[in-house]
Each structure stands twice: as structure tokens, then as C-alpha cells.
């Protein structure tokens, strides 16, 4: 009896080892995000990088705090105009970016392929209403992919040395907004009624996408504005131009448009003019373990559109908090960390 247990014990051991390896893979198999890592624990300090605007910085600090709460050393790098490029160049390990921008950048990597290859990546990118970094600088027109299709294409890419983690149920997708007074006065609630009114309306659009978006307005909606006012990056990240009636319609992002205090009306149907921008983390897999993947996915899973709106308001409102403080307070309110900073 005892003699027979040796081989059985060996088989059991091998089976458990195989099961352990499978579990290490499955631990990161969140919906739409499969990540293979060779280790359970992260072995080095991770560097996170985000764009320069306050909301991006607050989001980065929230992920950093989640990693720290899991016992992982992590720090924020200086803000970057092209955070995705910083990760791909090896100067950072993490960024949370819009899904279309990620798809456009990652689809160009050698060996990357999705359901339709690199062409699908290119077709999924279009105008970001506030910035124009190199990840999508070559995307001149909106693609044919909606938000769900973009995420599927993104998570289907085969990446070496990098991984796309779980997308949040929150977007920074572009949209068009107007004041409630303008909406009521012109009976304007969706893009189908925009064309005859455009010659009377001034649009505010960030400089980086002004040419492209103006062309899309004409091509898709037969909209030819009275004037297109070019907004600087700082102006475009807020909604003061439309609130102050400097312009009647402004291109902004969903987390800006939904703040109740601003009493803005989102023009329905405007999504056809902008690339989907679901918040999606990109990580380097070098020295990154399942502990980091789990911590990052935990935050992404909890992040909903209302949460992004609240975080944005905390970081950019009238009594704005510094991004690290906004992130810490938001995480505490959501009970996502065991040791609030």
C-alpha cells in the first residue's frame, strides 16, 4: 500500500502543479482580458504614467494607491503627452487610456493581431475631443467600431511584453454639449436637428481635432457652423466656453458633460463623430505578477461612469482637490482600499 502511494503522490503533485499554473493564468482572465504571467508576486517598483490633465492624473493616482494597498511599490511618473508611448518605450509600466487610442497604437506593434488585424485597429480610431497624441495622429476619420467592438478588438490583440487588462465601464468618449437654454430655445436635443441650425451656431473645438471634427460635421451631419472657435487644451478640458456663451456648442468628453451643476444638454447622436474611449489599463508584463493584475482589475471593475464623473468633479471643480487627494478620497468613499492614505 505504501509502495503504491509514491507514484500516486507524484502524479498528484504534478497535477497540482499543472492546476497551479492554470490558476495563475485564469486569475487574470477577467471578461475581455486574459493575461499570462510567470509569477504570482510583482518583484519591482512599478512606474505609472498619465496625461497632464487633472482627471487623468487623479485616475493614475487611484491605480497607484490600489497597487500600494496590495503591497506593491509604485510611483507616478511626470505627466506625459503620450502615456501609451511611454509604456511601449519601456519608460513606464502602466497607463490607463482610451480604448480606441490603445487599439490604434497597439495594433501597430510587430506580431499584434486582432479579429481583423492591424487594419481593424486603424479603423477604430478617430477624434479625441481634447488631445491629439501620436497614438492616433494618423487616424483622420472616425472608424466603424462602436465601444463594444473596439474593446473586443483591443482585447483580441496578441501582445508580447505587454498586456491589456479589464476595461472599466466608464468612458472619456467625446461628445457635443450645449446649455439647457440653447437646447430649449432651438428645440435641439439630437444631431438629427442640427443641420438647419448650424449656420447660426458657433462651435468650440480643441485645436488638435478642429479640422477633423469640422469635416466630420459637414460629411456626416451636413452641419456648417457659423464659426468654429479653436479652444486651447485647458479650455477644452472644461466646459466654461459653452457655459459662458462664448460658443453655443462645445466638443468635450462624457465625464465633463454629465456634471449636474453645469446643467448641460448632451446632444444625442454625437457619438458617431468620436472614437470610443473606454478606460482601459495597459501594463508591461516584465516583473509584474498576478498581485498587480488583481489590484488593477479590482479598480477597473468598480469604476463606473458616475464614478469617473465624480472623480473628475473632485479634481477639476470650483473647490478642486489636488489629484492625489482626489484619488485618495474617492477610493475611501468607494471602500476599495483597506488602508486609506
Model segments located where?
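Bacterial signal peptide processing site
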Residues: 29-33
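Short, well-ordered beta-strand elements
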Residues: 41-56, 72-78, 199-205
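Ligand-binding cleft/hinge of the Venus flytrap
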Residues: 63-70, 191-230
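Ligand-binding "clamshell"
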Residues: 106-165, 246, 258-271, 276
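A conserved helix-loop-strand patch within extracytoplasmic ligand-binding domains
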Residues: 132, 136-205, 301-305
Amino acid at each position: 500500500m505504501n509502495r503504491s502511494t509514491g507514484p500516486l503522490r507524484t502524479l498528484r503533485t504534478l497535477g497540482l502543479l499543472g492546476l497551479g499554473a492554470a490558476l495563475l493564468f485564469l486569475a487574470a482572465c477577467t471578461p475581455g482580458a486574459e493575461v499570462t504571467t510567470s509569477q504570482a508576486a510583482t518583484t519591482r517598483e512599478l512606474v505609472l504614467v498619465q496625461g497632464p490633465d487633472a482627471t487623468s492624473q487623479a485616475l493614475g493616482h487611484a491605480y497607484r494607491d490600489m497597487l500600494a494597498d496590495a503591497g506593491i511599490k509604485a510611483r507616478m511618473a511626470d505627466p506625459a503627452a503620450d502615456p501609451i508611448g511611454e509604456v511601449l518605450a519601456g519608460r513606464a509600466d502602466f497607463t490607463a487610456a482610451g480604448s480606441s487610442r490603445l487599439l490604434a497604437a497597439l495594433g501597430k506593434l510587430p506580431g499584434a493581431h486582432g479579429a481583423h488585424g492591424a487594419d481593424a485597429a486603424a479603423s477604430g480610431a478617430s477624434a479625441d475631443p481634447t488631445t491629439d497624441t501620436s497614438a492616433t495622429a494618423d487616424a483622420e476619420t472616425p472608424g466603424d467600431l462602436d465601444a463594444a467592438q473596439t474593446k473586443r478588438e483591443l482585447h483580441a490583440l496578441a501582445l508580447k511584453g505587454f498586456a491589456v487588462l479589464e476595461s472599466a465601464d466608464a468612458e472619456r468618449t467625446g461628445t457635443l454639449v450645449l446649455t439647457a437654454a440653447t437646447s430649449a430655445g432651438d428645440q435641439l436635443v439630437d444631431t438629427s436637428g442640427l443641420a438647419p441650425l448650424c449656420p447660426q451656431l458657433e462651435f468650440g473645438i480643441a485645436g488638435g481635432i478642429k479640422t477633423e471634427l469640422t469635416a466630420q460635421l459637414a460629411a456626416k451631419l451636413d452641419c456648417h457652423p457659423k464659426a468654429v472657435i479653436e479652444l486651447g487644451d485647458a479650455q477644452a478640458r472644461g466646459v466654461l466656453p459653452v457655459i459662458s456663451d462664448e460658443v453655443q456648442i462645445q466638443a468635450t468628453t462624457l465625464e465633463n458633460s454629465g456634471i449636474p451643476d453645469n446643467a448641460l444638454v448632451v446632444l444625442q447622436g454625437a457619438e458617431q463623430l468620436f472614437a470610443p474611449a473606454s478606460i482601459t489599463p495597459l501594463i508591461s508584463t516584465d516583473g509584474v505578477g498576478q498581485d498587480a493584475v488583481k489590484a488593477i482589475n479590482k479598480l477597473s471593475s468598480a469604476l463606473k461612469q458616475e464614478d469617473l464623473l465624480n472623480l473628475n468633479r473632485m479634481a477639476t471643480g470650483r473647490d478642486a482637490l489636488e489629484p492625489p487627494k482626489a484619488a485618495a478620497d474617492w477610493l475611501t468613499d468607494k471602500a476599495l482600499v483597506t488602508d486609506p492614505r
